[in-house]
From Swiss-Prot:
Record protein name field: Large ribosomal subunit protein bL20
GO biological process: ribosomal large subunit assembly; translation
UniProt lineage: Bacteria, Bacillati, Cyanobacteriota, Cyanophyceae, Synechococcales
Entry-linked PROSITE patterns: RIBOSOMAL_L20 (PS00937)
NCBIfam families for this protein: rplT_bact
Native species: Synechococcus sp. (strain CC9311)
Alphabetized Pfam families for the sequence: Ribosomal_L20
Described function: Binds directly to 23S ribosomal RNA and is necessary for the in vitro assembly process of the 50S ribosomal subunit. It is not involved in the protein synthesizing functions of that subunit.
Any one GO MF annotation of this record: structural constituent of ribosome
Family, similarity comment: Belongs to the bacterial ribosomal protein bL20 family.
Length: 115
C-alpha cells in the first residue's frame, strides 16, 4: 500500500479550528489544543443558549406585561385568562411591545378583557 502523508489534511483541520477560535483570549486563540477545547466549549454554549434565549425572552415579555397590567389594576394571570376568554389572539411578544411603546392601546386591551 502507498504511504499516506497527512500534511494538508491535518493542517486544514487545525486551521479550521484556529479560524473558529480567532479573537479568543491568550493561548486559547493561538495554540491548537487549547483552541480546540475552547471552540468545543463555545459551540456547546451556543447550542444551549439558542434554546435558552427563547425562554429568556418569554420571561422578559411576561415581566413587562405583568408590570403594565398591574399599572392598569389587573394581574398578569387575570389578564391572560381574560384574553383567552374574550378570544383575543395577541401573543406575549406583541403585548409586551404594546405595553412599552403604546400604553394607551395596551390599556384598551386590558379594558376589553374585563368587559
Amino acid at each position: 500500500m502507498a504511504r499516506v502523508k497527512r500534511g494538508n489534511v491535518a493542517r486544514k483541520r487545525r486551521n479550521k479550528i484556529l479560524r473558529l477560535a480567532r479573537g479568543f483570549r491568550g493561548s486559547n486563540g493561538t495554540l491548537f489544543r487549547t483552541a480546540n477545547q475552547r471552540v468545543m466549549k463555545a459551540l456547546c454554549n451556543a447550542y444551549r443558549d439558542r434554546r435558552r434565549r427563547k425562554r429568556d425572552f418569554r420571561r422578559l415579555w411576561i415581566a413587562r406585561i405583568n408590570a403594565a397590567a398591574r399599572m392598569n389594576g389587573v394581574s398578569y394571570s387575570r389578564l391572560i385568562g381574560g384574553l383567552k376568554k374574550a378570544d383575543v389572539r395577541i401573543n406575549r411578544k406583541m403585548l409586551a411591545q404594546m405595553a412599552v411603546v403604546d400604553p394607551a392601546s395596551f390599556a384598551n386591551v386590558v379594558n376589553a378583557t374585563q368587559g
